Amino acid sequence: MKVTKKVLDQSLCCTALLALVGGAAAQCALPSSYSWTSTGALAEPKAGWAALKDFTNVVFNGQHIVYGSVADTSGNYGSMNFGPFSDWSEMASASQNAMNQGTVAPTLFYFAPKDVWILAYQWGPTSFSYKTSSDPTDANGWSAAQPLFSGTISDSDTGVIDQTVIGDDTNMYLFFAGDNGKIYRASMPIDNFPGDFGTQSEIILSDTKENLFEAVQVYTVDGQNKYLMIVEAMGANGRYFRSFTADSLDGEWTVQAGTESQPFAGKANSGATWTNDISHGDLVRNNPDQTMTVDPCNLQLLYQGRDPNASGDYNLLPWKPGVLTLQV
């Protein structure tokens, strides 16, 4: 058959149309119930460390950049990052780099409007603090600490804990927990960021301590005009995540997968055999920027797990990284 330019043009047109239709079909809603597969433990703490935990992760230049907290063999907390790696199977051999100053329970993202990397954390000079950098791979290339939030909360043994930061087109939002059954929110105009959210916050969710414990994370759901929040809960069979959704970051949050038997992620649906706990971690994002965007067609959760037979001092429990992949 002789292929004329007209036929070729029509073929290319149809191919493009099919690709467009296929792309539209690929837009996924969040599932009504979740089922995952899990890796085993992906890395062992290096000598002198008892635990690797509280992970934050971005993909930059095709490589994972992971920061986290460490507990040493005396139960003291510090901070670290992994050397960049391309595939989760490479995490075990990636370097584990201690930070000179602690940035415990970190949140890492690229703030696009100012072309700067942000590392937000707790237990710094203020309730929450942040540092900036032009190179997120360098564990000790961060600026001096700056105030991110200076407020306090009541009815909490820990005080403010486990922040996350996310932005829309006009505002930046700070969400955090208190190990007390409450989730808190503060905001500022995006033009003022990076900066201090001040001293005021509002309670946006309230429940039992067990149901709203810590490790809150908030994400933009790609293509859905929706936001996803996950919060770590304490269950009869270990730590698990509950999920909530909202139509705007300043809006009301509605529980989505909220029970231990049907969680966002937990022993009931993780597929993990090496851990009962699915604890403090971070969904893998589409891009590293402040929108914290995740692809509902390809959800993965970097989490901390541990040997269920381990017991004793919480700060010495052998937490290690693992990854869940959503079954679709």
UniProtKB/Swiss-Prot annotation:
CDD domains in UniProt: GH62
Annotated signal peptide: 1-26
Chief localisation class: secreted
Subcellular localization(s) per the UniProt record: Secreted
Single GO cellular component term: extracellular region
Alphabetic keyword roster: Carbohydrate metabolism, Glycoprotein, Glycosidase, Hydrolase, Polysaccharide degradation, Secreted, Signal, Xylan degradation
EC class of the enzyme, as a word: hydrolase
Chemical reaction(s) catalysed: Hydrolysis of terminal non-reducing alpha-L-arabinofuranoside residues in alpha-L-arabinosides
EC number(s) reported in the record: 3.2.1.55
Gene Ontology biological process terms from the UniProt entry: L-arabinose metabolic process; xylan catabolic process
Glycosylation sites (chain numbering): N309
Function, in words: Alpha-L-arabinofuranosidase involved in the hydrolysis of xylan, a major structural heterogeneous polysaccharide found in plant biomass representing the second most abundant polysaccharide in the biosphere, after cellulose. Releases L-arabinose from arabinoxylan.
Family as reported in the entry's similarity comment: Belongs to the glycosyl hydrolase 62 family.
Name of the protein described by the UniProt record: Probable alpha-L-arabinofuranosidase axhA
Origin species: Aspergillus oryzae (strain ATCC 42149 / RIB 40) (Yellow koji mold)
